[in-house]
Amino acid sequence: MNQPRLASGQRNLELTSRVVSAYLSRNIVPAADLASLIQQTYLSLCSTSQADKAEEAAVEEQRPAVPIKKSVTADFIICLEDGKKFKSLKRHLMAKYGLTPQQYREKWGLPADYPMVASSYAQKRSELARALGLGKKRTAPELGSGLVNHSQKMTEAAMQIAEKKVWAHRS
């Protein structure tokens, strides 16, 4: 148990000597203030290393709000940080926790293919994109008719989706 403490103290002494040496190479310090500078630098490094250890312990103790296996359903993804349900998790993670999907996966030990969007939501968006003709190569539109055709396609696609929702709701 004393070994890590000695190693940490030794490390702080080395860092103190480096920091003070670098400071003295660019600044003039009276000899009377030198001892105070060394002491303040050492104490600052010690308090920083203690804060880092406390932070690491807090990170290690954190547990997911729900079991990982239950966090993915067809209709929503449950955030492991706070247990809230979302169709798309990416925006919530960045806004509330400042985490990217990759950082979130690393933090919780999730596989690289762990979804950030509920499967039913992704499927609905894919259907809408296909109905709008996205992903297909455009043909040269006739003068004046291209804009009308595009808006007609959008209206037809929206109507098809609305009809599906009505029939799904009635079933």
Swiss-Prot record:
<keyword id="KW-0614">Plasmid</keyword>
<protein>
    <recommendedName>
        <fullName>Putative MucR family transcriptional regulatory protein y4pD</fullName>
    </recommendedName>
</protein>
<dbReference type="GO" id="GO:0006355">
    <property type="term" value="P:regulation of DNA-templated transcription"/>
</dbReference>
<dbReference type="InterPro" id="IPR008807">
    <property type="entry name" value="ROS_MUCR"/>
</dbReference>
<comment type="similarity">
    <text>Belongs to the ros/MucR family.</text>
</comment>
<keyword id="KW-0804">Transcription</keyword>
<dbReference type="InterPro" id="IPR041920">
    <property type="entry name" value="ROS/MUCR_sf"/>
</dbReference>
<dbReference type="Pfam" id="PF05443">
    <property type="entry name" value="ROS_MUCR"/>
</dbReference>
<keyword id="KW-0238">DNA-binding</keyword>
<dbReference type="GO" id="GO:0003677">
    <property type="term" value="F:DNA binding"/>
</dbReference>
<dbReference type="GO" id="GO:0008270">
    <property type="term" value="F:zinc ion binding"/>
</dbReference>
<keyword id="KW-0805">Transcription regulation</keyword>
